From Swiss-Prot:
Matches recorded under InterPro entries: Prkrip1 (IPR009548)
Organism: Bos taurus (Bovine)
Subcellular location per the Swiss-Prot or TrEMBL entry: Nucleus; Nucleus, Nucleolus
Compositional bias annotation for Basic residues: 126-143
GO cellular component: nucleolus; spliceosomal complex
Pfam family, one: DUF1168
Polar residues bias: start-end ranges: 153-162
Quaternary structure and partners: Component of the pre-catalytic and post-catalytic spliceosome complexes. Interacts with EIF2AK2.
Protein name: PRKR-interacting protein 1
Chain's gene name: PRKRIP1
Main subcellular location: nucleus
One annotated GO molecular function: double-stranded RNA binding
Region span, Required for RNA-binding: 51-143
GO biological process, one term: RNA splicing
Amino acid sequence: MASSAASSVRPPRPKKEPQALIIPKNAAEEQKLKLERLMKNPDKAVPIPEKMSEWAPRPPPEFVRDVMGSSAGAGSGEFHVYRHLRRREYQRQDYMDAMAEKQKLEAEFQKRLERNKIAAEEQTAKRRKKRQKLKEKKLLAKKMKLEQKKQSEASSETQEQPSSGSEEASGTEDEEEDAPSFITGR
């Protein structure tokens, strides 16, 4: 008997250290406490709640044996049965109407979203086209400026070639003009 008592004795559980009671004052503190609790034991699985399923009424019965009316005799229990069936049917119809309205609103929302997306894409395309046009205009202006510069250089070279003697004299002037001048107004 002593051996059975010894085998049923379990080793003592490790004692948990006492924790101070912390009452969160706002949502951020509450979230912080939850995170700390989760991070104490990262191996433990985190409970993720399932999405609550939307309430739906019971489907209508496939076969109704006795179709009773509201004109059941006084004192009979049939009127209560009729009343409950009628209530369920009205509930089901209201639910179907609400779902149809919800689907209609969702479809309208999706259409509006699509229209907004198309309008935004059109606006973006318009602005992109404008940017490209400006870029091309700047590039064309730059090319024209380079061509004019080349033409002016070519024309100045053609003017300088016939007067080769004056070129030496004008060369010193060019050097003076190219030299940096720190005097304003020169």
